Every structure is written in C-alpha cells, then in structure tokens.
Regions:
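Nucleotide-sugar donor-binding catalytic core of glycosyltransferases
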Residues: 1-111, 118-141, 153-188
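Short helix-start
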Residues: 146-147
Length: 188
C-alpha cells in the first residue's frame, strides 16, 4: 500500500499526494559557486535593511512575471533590479531588504522562494492552495495580486520579518522534510 506520495510542483495534491519543496539551486558544474555563496551570505549579519521590498526576477520565464517591476520601480521603499545582477549582488541586495516578491517561475514553486527563506527574509507570493500548503509553516506574505502591495502593507506585516529572523535553517533541509513526511505518513 502507498502511504504517501511526495512530489515537487504537483499542483494536483491532496489525500496521499503532498507537496515537496523545490529547494535551492543545485550545483550545475564544478565552477558553479551559487550554493557556496548562499551559505556564506546567509550567515553574514552586518547588513542594514533600508528597503522594505526587493524585486528581481527574469520576466521571460513566466507570463505572470511581466509588469511586476513597473509597479514598484518608482518607490523609494523598494529596490528593483531592471536588469539581471550577479548572484552575489542578488544575495547582497536581498539582505538589504525585508520582503521579496516571489512570482512563480517555470513551475509554481521555484528556487527563489527557498533562497529568500534561507536568507531569513519574507517571500511575498500570490495565494495558491499548493503554495499555501507547502509554505504553511514559514513566514510568507500572501497576496491576491502583487499590485496590492504598499509600504503600509509591508509595515503592517513586519511581524513576518521577525519570524523570518527566527527560522531554524535546518528545517528547510531535505533530510528534515523527508523525516517529517515519513513520520506523518506512518503516524497520521
């Protein structure tokens, strides 16, 4: 008998099918140092947070990403990358911000969501039953439309930033997810 099926980007979930995290980008070559940079930057603490919101994404990877940058590029409380930045610069700029817009990528879950949590910042995502189930134990600001985000909304949800600072990073790992999923399947 099947106790549980755990699948990444399994939009049709429920019952025995449970969402699995996509996680951070895997090393794609010997020279790919993104994971090392992430590990280094996530422990650095000497950052000021002058920005409430960081917006940085490739607008060509999904239709829903188009036009989001235009919503925030003229706000002094938002940091918007008009063009692609290096991964190291991306992490530095993320550390300068409290929240980050995380639109879906090629699939509904993407690396960005997890990078933001590893950096102890708050992802801002569009409400979706799959994502809400997957991220139910993490500080996420849920919106129906990115256009509804204002500085006041972010200020009113500052408690999520405090929660993000207290994330136990081990709980974002694949072994933790595996152990939790197996435990739930056996003892639920």
């Amino acid at each position: 008998n099947v106790l549980r099926i755990s699948a990444v980007n399994a939009i049709a979930h429920g019952g025995k099918v449970v969402p699995a995290p996509y996680g951070v980008q895997r090393r794609m070559s010997d020279s790919d140092d993104r994971v090392d940079l992430l590990k280094k930057k996530m422990w650095e603490t000497d950052y000021l947070n002058p920005y409430y919101l960081y917006v940085s994404h490739n607008e060509d990877s999904h239709e829903e990403r188009k036009g989001i940058k235009d919503l925030f590029k003229n706000n002094i409380w938002a940091l918007v990358d008009e063009t692609r930045v290096s991964y190291e610069d991306f992490l530095f700029r993320l550390k300068q911000s409290k929240f980050m817009i995380c639109p879906r990528g090629n699939a509904i879950d993407c690396h960005r969501n997890w990078e933001v949590l590893y950096m102890k910042r708050v992802p801002v995502m569009k409400r979706d039953p799959y994502l809400q189930e997957l991220f139910k134990n993490y500080p996420v600001l849920w919106v129906d439309d990115f256009a509804e985000i204002t500085q006041k909304m972010l200020m009113d949800n500052y408690h999520l930033c405090e929660e993000a600072q207290n994330i136990i990073l081990g709980q974002l790992s694949l072994p933790y997810y595996f152990h939790t999923t197996v435990h739930q399947a056996l003892y639920a």
